[in-house]
Amino acid sequence: MLLQTIPEGLGLGALLVAVCAVGIRKGAVGMVHLYDPKVQERCMALGLTTREKIKRDALRFKAICIPMYLAYVLLCVYAINGAHTFWSGFWQCLVILSVMNLIDRFGIDGYWVGHTRAWVIPGTEDLMPYISKADKQKKWLFGTMGMAVFSLILAGIGMLL
């Protein structure tokens, strides 16, 4: 089953990359809701966005993307892979979400945001790196723990389906 769930995790990671690519298609300010508050404040001071737009974009991201990601995982684990027990569902969810988390940490945060110009917002370069060492540590900790918690919740939901 591991050989099936790892590619499913890669698919979820690709979905995350696609969401980010769409979000920054007109410039990185389109995803400024994911940046540190200092960067957000600078973008507002420069007239690149407003607090209302940042809040609206953050809400839209949470309302559309998170349910889409969770539905993808449930579809893979229960409809495609046919998990029947809580623990089988939990482990499959955990593998899929963990692979996506690795893509997010290394591929998106580590490389795309950290080593390319795609996420640079003009006028905020002095605030780089956009993801500080402390933020990276928090993302690793909460990302890893969060994936386990989400996996428990999804396995519980899967038992109700």
Positions of PLM-derived features:
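Cytosolic-side membrane-entry/anchor segment at the start of a transmembrane helix
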Residues: 24-65
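Core segments of transmembrane alpha-helices
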Residues: 60-78, 139-153
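C-terminal halves and exits of single transmembrane alpha-helices
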Residues: 97-105, 109, 131-150
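Juxtamembrane boundary at the C-terminal end of a transmembrane helix
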Residues: 153-161
